[in-house]
Amino acid sequence: MKPFKANVIIMIVTLFWGSSYLFMKLGLDSVQPFNLIALRFGLAFIAAGVLFAGRLRRNTNVSVLKHAALLGFILFGVFASIMLGLQGTSTSNAGFLMSLTVIFVPVLSAVFGKTLPSRRLVLGVLLAMTGIGLLTLRPQSGIGLGDLWCILGALLFAVHMMLTGRAVKKSPDPLCIGIWQLGFAGAFGLAFTVLWETPRLPGSISGWVAVLALSLVCSALGFILQTMAQQYTTATQAGLIFALEPVVAAVFGLLFMNETMSVQGYVGAGLVLFGVALSELNVSRLLGRKKQPRHEAAG
C-alpha cells in the first residue's frame, strides 16, 4: 500500500471517529452509558472476531488475554468518561477535549521517563491549556462537570495508548490483543450495566442506528482499517490526520445537532487544535533538517 492511500484510509477512520461523538449522543437518548458501552464493544468484538476467527484461535494465549483484559478495562474507563461527559457538554467540546490525549501522552512519558519535555511540547501544552480555559470556563459556573469527565477520558486514553505500546511489543500478534480488548471492554460494560443500570436494547430506530454505527463502523471497521493503514505511513502524518477528529466532531455537531460555539469557544478550540498539532509536528524533520541530539523526550 502506498503512503498516500494509507493516509486517505486514516482520513476515513478520522471521519468515523469524529462522527462517534454524535452517535454516542444519540445512543444516550435510548440507553444508559454503561449499557451503550456494552452494546458497542460487544457487537464490535463479535464482528471483528468473526473476521479474524482463525487468527484468534492460533495466537490467543494467557499473556494476550492478560494484556487485553487490562487494556479493555482502561478502554471501558475512557468511554465511560466520555459518555458521562456527553450528558453535560456538547459533542464539539467533547471532541476538542478528547484531542488532549495527543498532549497527555508525551507529558506522561516525560514525567514517568524522567526526561525533559521538548520546547514545542511545552508550548503546545500551554496553548492547549489556554484553549481549554476559553472553551470550557463559564462566567457564572466555571468549568462544567461534563467537560471534566471528557478531560479525564483524554487522560485515561493517553494511559491506554502508552500501555498498548508496551503490550504489542511483547506480543507476536498485536491484532489479537486489539480484538480481545474490545470483548473485555464490552464485558466490563455489561457488568457495570447489571450493577448500576437496567440492561435493555434500544427502543427506537435512531438508537439502533447509533449502536450499529458505533460498533460496526466506528469500532470494528475503524480499528481494522487503522491497523492496516498505519504501518504504511509515518507516526507524524497519522497523528496530524487524527488531530482533525475534533474538527469532524464539531462539523457533525453543527450539521445534525445544531450545536454552535461562541467566538470565545471557537478561539479556544483553535488553540487546542494548534497546541495538539504543534506537539505532534516536527518542523525540522518535515523540512529535511538535521537536529542536534538533545536530552529531551520525543514529543
Where are the regions that the model predicts?
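Glycine-/small-residue-enriched transmembrane alpha-helix faces in small-molecule transporters
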Residues: 1-35, 81, 141-166, 188, ...
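Specific transmembrane alpha-helical segments of multi-pass solute transporters/efflux pumps
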Residues: 16, 20-21, 49-98, 134, ...
